[in-house]
């Protein structure tokens, strides 16, 4: 059944941090599919994302204080599904999806080469919101590379485009 507040534009959020797994520290690059996000201020330019408390990306963003909002075209629908279903604790989502990792311009965080645009964000506030945490990030760099049909999530595995 469609949700009252959908469809919502789907983004891929990337993040990076050193985390401890099974007694070993390793650098983790992760991608999470997010449909709950929005601009929250023009001056300064702020953007908010909502991450579930059980997600691996939550710990990464809390520690690193940075994330990249990757706006994706409709043709990356399968990558969005993979990144929404697999856990970053057990999978390298860049390898699983075939997406290309690039370094960001102003923060220590990867971005996705195939994205049509980016917002590089430094976390300035965390808000506890039930079973999610809302991260408010100050946008340190933004770029729109091309204007393509974007991906919108309806419900389940169903998507639309513009």
Locations of regions flagged by a protein language model:
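Basic, polyanion-binding surface patches
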Residues: 1-162
């Amino acid at each position: 059944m469609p949700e009252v507040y959908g469809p919502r534009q789907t983004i891929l959020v990337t993040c990076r941090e050193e985390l401890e797994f099974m007694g070993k520290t390793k650098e983790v690059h992760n991608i999470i599919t997010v449909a709950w996000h929005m601009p929250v201020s023009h001056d300064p330019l702020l953007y908010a994302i909502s991450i579930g408390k059980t997600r691996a990306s939550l710990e990464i963003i809390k520690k690193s204080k940075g994330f990249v909002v990757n706006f994706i075209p409709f043709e990356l629908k399968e990558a969005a599904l993979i990144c929404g279903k697999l856990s970053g604790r057990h999978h390298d989502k860049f390898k699983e999806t075939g997406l290309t990792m690039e370094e960001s311009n102003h923060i220590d965080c990867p971005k996705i080469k195939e994205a049509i645009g980016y917002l590089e964000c430094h976390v300035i506030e965390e808000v506890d919101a039930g079973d999610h945490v809302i991260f408010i990030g100050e946008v340190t760099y933004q770029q729109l590379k091309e204007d393509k049909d974007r991906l919108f999530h309806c419900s389940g595995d169903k998507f639309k485009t513009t």
